[in-house]
């Protein structure tokens, strides 16, 4: 267990039970950290997550060379066996607002209401993360062969759990263009290369030194054969002769001011994710983010709190 992620970082043995129950919505980084913290203090913790295994994007989005799956699973095992944390997988929590679709929703076999959890627990913590990719807002993003970062990465890790309705993006022998320079974009480029892409080109609107993932990560990808184009601003995604599938990316060279057309079979827009809690209005999350609350991170519903990416 020495390589396990230490979610229960406060103590080696659990404290005596204090008789209080807490529900955590989401089993990603913030949810598991909250479960470990509360488990150490003697709370009975129930974790609800839509995916088939705990870990969130650590397990279902980030490639294994960055975060090995066995480290996550060992940490979860410790939470469950030693600290009594119960995990309710494949469970989607909703509110009165209509459900919106996100990556991984098809795994859910059970849908429960937030009100139920509030009634059954002394407190609820929403750690549902950021499961919606930002859009560029340029023409052609709806074409076949265009993916967001999550749409590209999620199936690669999820396919082992649901082969019938999840498929890995077909990139073998093709040209893949990745827009963005954060860690997700680096993960996309690395994964495309590992899946056998003939050519991987990274496109960024600033310079390598300004890449959010750091110039070191960019250099690592260049070393394995990826190409890097900087100071490029995407203008539109060009369709093929059928008008249905991507054929190229049209962009502006920020140095020369000229317009360029880069041929592509697959384009991945990886410019960040945004939180999509299904109860945003009901909980008054804008006020929570501004700090206009009675208790730190408590929503407009008594004893319902938020943590992690939901706060961003």
List each model region and its residues.
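N-terminal Rossmann-like FAD-binding beta1-loop-alpha1 element of flavoenzymes
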Residues: 21-46, 185-193
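Phosphate-coordination loops involved in phosphoryl transfer and adenosine-cofactor binding
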Residues: 18-21, 90, 172-175, 231, ...
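Conserved hydrophobic helix-helix packing surfaces used for dimerization/oligomerization
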Residues: 22-24, 45, 176, 200, ...
